[in-house]
UniProtKB/Swiss-Prot annotation:
Belongs to the RuvB family. Pfam families: AAA_lid_4, RuvB_C, RuvB_N. It catalyses: ATP + H2O = ADP + phosphate + H(+). GO terms for biological process: DNA recombination; DNA repair. The keyword Kinase does not apply. Mg(2+) binds at residue 66. Its EC number is 3.6.4.-. This is Holliday junction branch migration complex subunit RuvB. InterPro entries: AAA+_ATPase (IPR003593), AAA_lid_4 (IPR041445), DNA_helicase_Holl-junc_RuvB (IPR004605), P-loop_NTPase (IPR027417), RuvB-like_N (IPR008824), RuvB_C (IPR008823), WH-like_DNA-bd_sf (IPR036388), WH_DNA-bd_sf (IPR036390). DNA binds at residues 291, 310, 312, 315.
């Protein structure tokens, strides 16, 4: 069973996100620093009648990297071709995609850190000089074919920017760090979603829901749907702060946006290792989760909220973690 606070896409959420997706930067809520920079770069590229420099968007899942890619294409007035790193298994797959691009088009590669090295190497000349050299045939009869490409913009999205090779990262002229959303922005997103789907919600309820959504629109919209169900069956259909608190408590989402897995991580650190330091591998084994899952899905939010510290010796639970879970904290 998937956890309610998982920031990866579940079920029909891709369709829901497409329905909610803003079309232009002025409609995009939050990520102001990234938006302000992109607005300038896009306008400058349009004035020069050039393709926008390649863009790298990085940050945790669910923060709107795919949405931002579509917004950029709309702002440029060009087509967007969408694919992902795991889908492009060999260089020929990438060549076929590049060959379909029109001048100025956007190629969006999600999970770009998962591109095979053989594919990544083809991208170098395509990104830098808009051409590719490919080998046709095999053995002594093989020959190199030079293909010119129209100017295009590559938008890469990744949750693990550190896994990108230096040569690939260096070819992105624009980088955008997608951060967890501020409470006010997330509240506005919840209210916008409720309005689009004709849900009746109070501002206080939207604010409480945003507070417990881990700074992530995808999670906020998912929780909103579950709270709506609760309001429909237990209440009178109106989503207010009382209904919201009851629903989220039933879903094991506390007032800091932590669920049972987050609390299990913190309790394990405190009860078994005296608050740490404890290695990530050891911690993962103790809570029966994959190391990569803990590192990518749980830890970033716990660090951002000040419940965990990274040290050279390992992870440590903070005084805030002790206080939140009701433990007495003795500073080491």
């Amino acid at each position: 069973m998937s956890r309610i606070l998982d920031n990866e896409i579940m079920g029909d959420e891709e369709l829901v996100e497409r329905t909610l997706r803003p079309q232009y930067l002025r409609e995009y809520i939050g990520q102001d620093k990234v938006k302000d920079q992109l607005q300038i770069f896009i306008e400058a590229a349009k004035m020069r009648d050039e393709a926008l420099d390649h863009v790298l968007l990085f940050g945790p899942p669910g923060l709107g990297k795919t949405t931002m890619a579509f917004v950029i294409a709309n702002e440029l007035g060009v087509n967007l071709k969408q694919t992902s790193g795991p889908v492009i298994e060999k260089a020929g797959d990438l060549v076929a995609i590049l060959n379909e691009l029109e001048p100025g088009d956007v190629l969006f590669i999600d999970e770009i850190h998962r591109l095979p090295m053989s594919v990544e190497e083809v991208l170098y000349s395509a990104m830098e000089d808009f051409y590719i050299d490919i080998m046709i045939g095999a053995g002594e009869g093989s020959r190199s074919v030079h293909l010119e490409l129209p100017p295009f913009t590559l938008i890469g999205a990744t949750t693990r920017a550190g896994m990108l090779s230096n040569p690939l990262r260096a070819r992105f002229g624009i980088t955008g760090h997608m951060e967890y959303y501020a409470h006010a922005d997330l509240t506005e997103i919840v209210e916008r979603t409720a309005d689009i789907f004709e849900m009746e919600i109070t501002h206080e309820a939207a604010s409480e829901l945003a507070l417990r959504s881990r700074g992530t629109p995808r999670i906020a919209n998912r929780l909103l749907k579950r709270v709506r169900d609760f309001a429909q069956i237990v209440g009178n259909g109106v989503i207010d702060d009382v209904i919201t608190d009851k629903a989220l408590t039933m879903l094991d989402v506390d007032h800091e946006g932590l669920d049972y897995v987050d609390q299990k991580i913190l309790r394990t650190m405190i009860e078994m290792y005296g608050g740490g330091p404890v290695g990530l591998g050891t911690l993962s084994v103790n809570i029966a989760e994959e190391r990569e899952t803990v590192e990518d899905m749980y830890e970033p939010y716990l660090i951002q909220k000040g419940f965990i510290m990274r040290t050279r010796s390992g992870r440590m639970a903070t005084a805030k973690a002790y206080e939140h879970l009701g433990y007495e904290y003795n500073e080491k």
